[in-house]
């Protein structure tokens, strides 16, 4: 590629202008109706909600999200039947792994740490830069007090002791993304110390860690982010100084983890905690949270009581990368030591999809960074009244919310954890809104005696929000399926409004529509093809459930039993009731009759009565 002209670079660096040459405009996807027309005959529209069969042109190619790439790779590996390697194990016989983690998280603030410039991640490059951000002569740091609030919430969520007095230090190094030649951090006197976080078996920790494991948090400190580097052709790098000076917290754990999976779970849980308390709403998938891991190994025979030489793996950007990088580095160190070679202290890198780490540079020590107190910034004094207020107003912890979802709402531990983790907690807010609307609609229409058991519909709502909404974006949903659903932090879904889903599930709970009709109605909502509301769509298309009468159940059961003498004999001779054979006969009833008008429980009841009668004859 030709070198980028100096004029183009100047426009970018000085005014944030980007050449739009080569941009590809997105094509618009053709719409089609998921609802049958009211003018179509009842025979074609009644009972079922059909999707139009007209040919739809394929959508334009879209970048595949990283999460989907990882899932696809895992499925492919499983399909090919790859054998587990040594690195797949959480332990290696004769060796102990020790891991410590440093997490860098961007705080949810409107201003930078030491300048009034706004924080922005999507605006034009270099459009939010103050003089101090560029270290212009004569500019001075001005601590933005509001940045302290989310930092304190994060430290409290991690059970840290807040220090009344803390100070800022300069960490010296020279690189193009740090114009001042040093980073302002809190190396000697951080604002929070001595925290801890407890990981439970349901969080997904390694089985070797038992039911729970508690990891110490050494300290939490405030610091600045660096500029964003955009690599170009011919070894040219562009810099976006919008990010320089953005407030970060660095969370440093104690080296107390001994299994790769547990370390990955720790990062995921800290990310969830920070989002819950509104300290960091941008996760690893968007670059708002990065992890560095320190890895060392030693023999378990007692020949080396002290920890081994540690290496640091920098800038891991996914949960999976944390686990995979630790496994790869552990196995590398063991191989080196078994070959009689020493492990140098160094910084290493990791590439997604790789099976080994790579050397970046020798490990820089404390002397190299020349830490010194920053003489331009006054000590940070934090009052007990502020800490007490934030502690009282802190959001419910994910563990407490998980217990509530399981005990009160009847969700499984796996579903409850998914609900909390999806969309950084926005999906669980959506769940509460939909469930509240369903409950209010039921209470308005039914007497107290008629009201169904709470858990019977709370679990239904949960299953639909976790599983049925997820199916909307899979390849099975057809060419109009989007990559992801969009949720706001308040719990609003842009594609499936909570009011529409609540109305749909209300009719399903009342057994006024079948599950199949409900699923196709949901897809119609997703495509924005419903006009006049859910109830009107059901009415216009004659989709109300009309169950067959009792005598038709009896007739279907009799027809199914004909020619099944061998199966029926098992109901006469059994020692243990053959439930599987019963469901086989019920399945034949469903296929023989009008499926959309049959209640499976009623079909099972009628068939059970008939086969039990055989034994008494």
UniProtKB/Swiss-Prot annotation:
GO function terms (MF aspect):
ATP binding; glutaminyl-tRNA synthase (glutamine-hydrolyzing) activity
Q: Where is the composition biased (Basic residues)?
A: 76-85
Reactions catalysed according to its record: L-glutamyl-tRNA(Gln) + L-glutamine + ATP + H2O = L-glutaminyl-tRNA(Gln) + L-glutamate + ADP + phosphate + H(+)
Do you know which PROSITE patterns this protein is assigned to? GATB
Q: Where in the cell is it found?
A: Mitochondrion
Q: What is this protein called?
A: Glutamyl-tRNA(Gln) amidotransferase subunit B, mitochondrial
Keywords annotated in UniProt: ATP-binding, Ligase, Mitochondrion, Nucleotide-binding, Protein biosynthesis, Transit peptide
Per its UniProt record, what NCBIfam families does this chain match?
Answer: gatB, PRK05477.1-2
Q: Signal peptide position in this chain?
A: none
Function noted in UniProt: Allows the formation of correctly charged Gln-tRNA(Gln) through the transamidation of misacylated Glu-tRNA(Gln) in the mitochondria. The reaction takes place in the presence of glutamine and ATP through an activated gamma-phospho-Glu-tRNA(Gln).
Region labeled Disordered — which residues? Answer: 53-90
Q: Which GO terms describe its cellular component?
A: glutamyl-tRNA(Gln) amidotransferase complex; mitochondrion
Alphabetical GO biological process terms = glutaminyl-tRNAGln biosynthesis via transamidation; mitochondrial translation
Q: What class of enzyme is it?
A: ligase
Q: What InterPro entries does the record tag this protein with?
A: Asn/Gln-tRNA_amidoTrfase_suB/E, Asn/Gln-tRNA_Trfase_suB/E_cat, Asn/Gln_amidotransferase, GatB, Gln-tRNA_amidoTrfase_suB_CS, Gln_synth/guanido_kin_cat_dom
Is Ligase one of the keywords?
yes
Its quaternary organisation is: Subunit of the heterotrimeric GatCAB amidotransferase (AdT) complex, composed of A, B and C subunits.
Q: Please state the Enzyme Commission number of this protein.
A: 6.3.5.-
Q: What residues does the transit peptide encompass? A: 1-56
Q: Which family does it belong to?
A: Belongs to the GatB/GatE family. GatB subfamily.
């Amino acid at each position: 590629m030709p070198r980028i002209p100096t004029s183009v670079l100047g426009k970018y660096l000085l005014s944030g202008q980007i050449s739009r040459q080569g941009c590809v405009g997105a094509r618009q996807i053709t719409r089609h109706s998921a609802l049958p027309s009211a003018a179509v005959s009842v025979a074609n529209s009644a009972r079922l909600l059909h999707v139009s069969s007209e040919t739809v042109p394929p959508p334009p190619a879209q970048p595949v999200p990283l999460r989907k790439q990882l899932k696809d790779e895992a499925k492919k590996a499983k399909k090919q039947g790859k054998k587990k390697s040594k690195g797949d194990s959480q332990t290696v016989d004769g060796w102990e792994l020790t891991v410590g983690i440093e997490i860098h998280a961007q705080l949810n603030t409107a201003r930078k740490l030491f300048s009034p410039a706004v924080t922005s991640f999507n605006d034009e490059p270099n459009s939010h830069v103050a003089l101090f951000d560029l270290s212009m002569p004569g500019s001075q740091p001005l601590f933005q007090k509001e940045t302290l609030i989310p930092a304190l919430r994060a430290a409290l969520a991690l059970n840290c002791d807040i220090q009344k007095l803390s100070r800022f230090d300069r960490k010296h190094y020279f690189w193009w993304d740090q114009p001042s030649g040093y980073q302002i951090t809190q190396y000697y006197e951080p604002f929070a110390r001595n925290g801890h976080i407890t990981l439970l078996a349901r969080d997904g920790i390694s089985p070797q860690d038992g039911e729970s494991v508690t990891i110490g948090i050494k300290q939490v400190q405030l610091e600045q982010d660096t500029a964003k580097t955009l690599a170009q052709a011919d070894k040219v790098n562009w810099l976006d100084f919008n990010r320089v000076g953005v407030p970060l917290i660095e969370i440093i754990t104690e080296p107390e983890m001994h299994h790769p999976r547990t370390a990955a779970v720790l990062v995921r849980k800290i990310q969830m905690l920070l989002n819950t308390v509104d300290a960091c709403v941008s996760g690893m998938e968007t670059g708002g949270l990065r992890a560095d891991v320190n890895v060392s190994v030693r023999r378990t025979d007692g020949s080396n009581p002290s920890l081994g030489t540690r290496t640091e793996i920098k800038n891991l950007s996914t949960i999976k990368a944390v686990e995979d990088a630790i496994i790869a580095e552990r196995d590398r160190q063991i191989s080196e030591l078994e070959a009689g070679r020493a492990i140098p202290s160094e910084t290493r890198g990791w590439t997604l999809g790789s099976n080994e780490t790579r050397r970046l540079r020798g490990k820089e020590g404390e002397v190299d960074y020349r830490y010194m107190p920053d003489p331009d910034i006054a000590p940070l004094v934090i009052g007990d009244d502020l800490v007490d207020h934030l502690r009282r107003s802190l959001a419910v912890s994910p563990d407490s919310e998980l217990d509530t979802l399981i005990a009160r709402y009847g969700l499984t531990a796996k579903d409850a954890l998914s609900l909390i983790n999806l969309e950084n907690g926005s999906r669980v807010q959506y769940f509460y809104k939909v469930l509240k609307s369903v409950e209010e609609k039921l209470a308005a229409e039914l007497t107290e005696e008629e009201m169904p058991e709470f858990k019977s519909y709370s679990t239904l709502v949960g299953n639909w929000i976790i599983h049925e909404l997820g199916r909307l974006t899979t390849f099975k949903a057809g060419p109009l399926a989007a990559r992801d659903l969009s949720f706001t932090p308040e719990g609003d879904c842009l594609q499936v409004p909570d009011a529409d889903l609540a109305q749909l599930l209300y009719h399903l709970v009342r057994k006024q529509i079948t599950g199949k009709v409900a699923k196709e109605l949901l897809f119609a909502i997703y495509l924005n093809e419903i006009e006049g509301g859910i109830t009107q769509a059901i009415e216009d298309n004659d989709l109300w459930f009309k169950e067959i009468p009792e005598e038709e159940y009896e007739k279907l059961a009799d027809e199914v039993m004909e020619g099944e003498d061998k199966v029926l004999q098992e109901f006469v001779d059994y020692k243990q009731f053959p439930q599987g054979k019963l469901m086989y006969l019920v399945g034949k009833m469903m296929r023989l009759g009008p499926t959309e008008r049959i209640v499976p429980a009623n079909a099972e009841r009628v068939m059970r009565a008939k086969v039990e009668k055989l034994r008494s004859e």
